[in-house]
Amino acid sequence: MNNKEIVAKALHDVLNEELTMDQIEQLLENPKSVDHGDVAFPAFSLAKIYRKAPQQIAAELAEKIDGTNFEKIEVVGPYLNFFMNKEAVSQAVIGEVVKEKNNYGNSTFGNNGNVPIDMSSPNIAKPISMGHLRSTVIGNSIAFILEKIGYQPIRINHLGDWGTQFGKLIVAYKKWGSEEAVRQQPINELLRLYVQFHEEAEEKPELEDEARAWFKKLEEGDQEANELWKWFRSESLKEFDKIYSMLEVEFDSYNGEAFYNDKMDEIVTLLEEKHLLTENQGAEIVDLTEYNLNPALIRKSDGATLYITRDLAAALYRKRTYDFAKSLYVVGNEQSNHFKQLKAVLKELGFDWSDDMEHIPFGLITQGGKKLSTRKGKIVLLEEVLNEAVTLAGNQINEKNPDLANREEVAKQVGVGAVIFHDLKNDRLNNFDFVLDEVVRFEGETGPYVQYTHARAMSILRKANFTPDATQRYALNDKDSWEVVKLLQKFPETVMQAAEKYEPSVIAKHSIHLAQAFNKYYAHVRILDEDAQKEARLALVYAVATVLKEDLRLLGLHAPEEM
């Protein structure tokens, strides 16, 4: 139970059912100053019920409430200020973390419901840029968070592996490419060929016709075209996997656009049967006027299907395959109209499960306030940024701890973790500025700061040779530990809040606040002093290390034990 639940129950016991537990909890406030207690209840809402002044109601309630869980209850005007019993609360919180370990904060809320998460989704034959970072790490973190509250996440990398660009690539490869060059540097070479095609096509527009012809062959199942396409795809995936393994992101499915080639006819047939298709300048559309949306373009005048047709097929496939409780699409803000159309068309088809589909949009990464897309005219490659971050982290670790045994491994965990953490600590919908030197700093609100705090806690536990005992009573009642205990207590509701809002930043901010509170505690309290409270203090350190590690895991970061 958190402090608000404890207070709500105490009030509910004396309020004769006038308000439900939930209603009371909604009214409770966190006082701005510690002088006003840990939880405050404003009695205004009871004035009408009791036909008395709020001040009088507050005073009468204070007399009736069972004070077992409180050090004191103060009446200040119309407010009841509750000061929690630090010993009782700290014993309960530390005891629960010691007992549950990394399962602290787990719940069965999700009831094992499947949740496909459409995330990352780069285009084949193009490099993974910093622009792909957000979808990848936000999706991965949401998956961990949902798993913690009892859902079964399914990470789907909906690859951009189909389209007219493959006709261009085949032409370019046959004219100017070599197998060896593609094998050595798949993405760089395929991108070079793609760029060369566009440069040459300016002088020779007939190349565009050749590309269209090759894409038509590919669509018709031509053996040579199909083998080249498969090869471009598999070589690209090898390159992508290097980056995914750096980020330690694993996917359950790589079903991309091509996977749905044979599944779109059914969608068109369903739309026809429901008489939802209307002709517009030779193209076929679904009118979405009643949803205040532009029409959804299903099929072009040349019979080619469009992106939304593929997404409709994918949505139907995912429902049939996973029977999802919810289905998430972690895709940038600019796609919001597309997803509104997607859900509206499914609704028109009578698929009410479309209500369980959600677009999880996010803002842009910027540099100096401008969209981060190019550096010296080139795409900012994610792999280069991650490698640079690892180097910077390694340099700092060498300065702080040159004798560290597994320096390279820790540098990777800290450097890559720093980039992920910086993304996730920002509210998902906000744009944010990216300056690598600041991201990898060991001070301030950074991933390395939280990781370093965890390593510090582990170092104290090693020095004391401390292992907590779940049968022991670990209680503290000092002011310094209380701030730490309150943040530990808040962790389960933080996880729930992050899950409800699909907002990893809630977890990142909790980790920062807990690290800050613990470092303050470390500075003020002699943890290893031999006295009656030593074991309880060490149990608190253990609880901090456990919860920080879990905070970091939910964000997709490691928690090194030494740094």
UniProtKB/Swiss-Prot annotation:
It is found in: Cytoplasm. GO terms for molecular function: arginine-tRNA ligase activity; ATP binding. GO terms for biological process: arginyl-tRNA aminoacylation. It holds the Pfam family tRNA-synt_1d. Keywords: Aminoacyl-tRNA synthetase, ATP-binding, Cytoplasm, Ligase, Nucleotide-binding, Protein biosynthesis. Its EC number is 6.1.1.19. The keyword Transmembrane helix does not apply. It catalyses: tRNA(Arg) + L-arginine + ATP = L-arginyl-tRNA(Arg) + AMP + diphosphate. The keyword Transmembrane does not apply. A motif ('HIGH' region) lies at residues 122-132. One of its GO terms (cellular component) is cytoplasm. SMART domains: Arg_tRNA_synt_N, DALR_1. Monomer. NCBIfam families: argS (TIGR00456). Belongs to the class-I aminoacyl-tRNA synthetase family. This is Arginine--tRNA ligase. It comes from Enterococcus faecalis (strain ATCC 700802 / V583). The lineage of its organism: Bacteria, Bacillati, Bacillota, Bacilli, Lactobacillales. The gene is argS.
